[in-house]
Amino acid sequence: MRRVKYIILGAGSSGLTALGRIRRETDDFVMINGGAFGTTCARVGCMPSKALIHCAEHFHARKHFYDFGIDGADGLTINHTAVMKRVRAFRDRFTSGVQAGSTDTLGPDQLIKGFAKFVAPDIVEVNGEKIQGERIIIATGSRPVVPDAWKSLGDKLITSDEVFELEALPKRIAVIGLGIIGLEIGQALSRLGVEVIGFEMSNTLCGLQSPKASRQAIKLISREFPIYLGEAATVEETREGVKITVSSGTFEVDAVFASLGRRPNLDGIGLEALGVDLDNKGMPPFNIHTMQVSDLPVFIAGDVNGFRPILHEAGHEGKIAVNNAMAYPNMTAYKRKTPLGIAFVDPQIGFFGVGYESLDLDQTVVINFKLERNNGRAIVMGEDKGVISLYADKASKQLIGGELIMPHAEHFTHLLTWAVEQQLEVLELLRMPYYHPVLEEAVESAIGLLAEALYTRDEIEALETLSQN
């Protein structure tokens, strides 16, 4: 039986991060990958979706040309085939780039293509071969959730795994599940001329928790395509397409885009052989600060553990896992990053830090700043719609979280997340310089509202003096 120091299961973001670190120390490893290469982000997630969104944004802009004195927009048309070809070209560029610097450089003794299964806590079997590893990192990723009853729809059922392969877009599509992926794809398809209807089981979009931000998101996004919230949808194939039924009525579409979340790729890898208790979803016990499974020399990182299934977290978990795998049995508990999420819709949606539903409202200041008619730059852009919801701890006076729906929220969400990560007080944020006229002034106004609730007028007015010191 072959023996190696490290076994990495999965060649996604976490697995490749671990691979890079291990290769700097030793060649005594094997990477085993049973699915497609190139990472979820590059192949079916972040990157191709942004390519699609940018095409949609450019075409949608024609609707506002007249307001800016530009005539002739009515004559513009969209070539769906060319759009999807462009999306795939970028997708292929990114996936090729990922592989060129990682798996393409591995020899056949270091990279095995196949699905591995644990047969003992330190042994996996792949393609009929058993391999023993001193330390094992599980990074097998995730896949779209598809209800069994829907699978009979065949090619009328589309997930993020298939949408970017479409040569032509359907005329009518139901987007079921309006989290980040569903909302991004739904709005993009709508702007490209597809008739879109959105359905979501919860009463919010993108998992927003702030009541004000949630209402604003629903109001603004539903102007582009109809949205039905708080309703379970049933699907039924018809001769012409698919029938969608909710309590509000029945709708006929040509296809369904299922965006019901992602399921960790745990099944089939033999985790029961680890000798630890698995939960009702088949997940082994693991520490989010070490990525260690129980007390074993086994680590689980990235989408497969279901903790924070997003690229930057997968990379971070890959680093934690490999550092502790290399140091085993001496474990280091790493501080996790401040939660951060962004939806690339229009207006963009961002959320960070502590969620509204987790707040102790008696110990927290909550403010809501409406962008409408309150920011000069947004007004001249014709985009003064949105809200900034921020939360600050009364005792420490630190910013602890928030949600935004506004133009270019991706940038301001980062800015505010960094402030939470640095444990900055609200007054320190208000002391920062703000140029004019910029959208950042909206953030300044929102922070100012927090300051008014946390500090005396004298403390706020003393800012200039404090800055000079």
Per-region residue spans from a language model:
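Short hydrophobic core segments
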Residues: 7-9, 116, 131-141, 175-176, ...
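FAD-binding beta-loop-beta segment adjacent to the flavin cofactor pocket
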Residues: 144, 282-297, 377-389
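A conserved FAD-binding loop/helix module that cradles the flavin
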Residues: 209, 213-216, 301-357, 436-459, ...
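Glycine-rich flavin
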Residues: 2-4, 11, 20-27, 32-169, ...
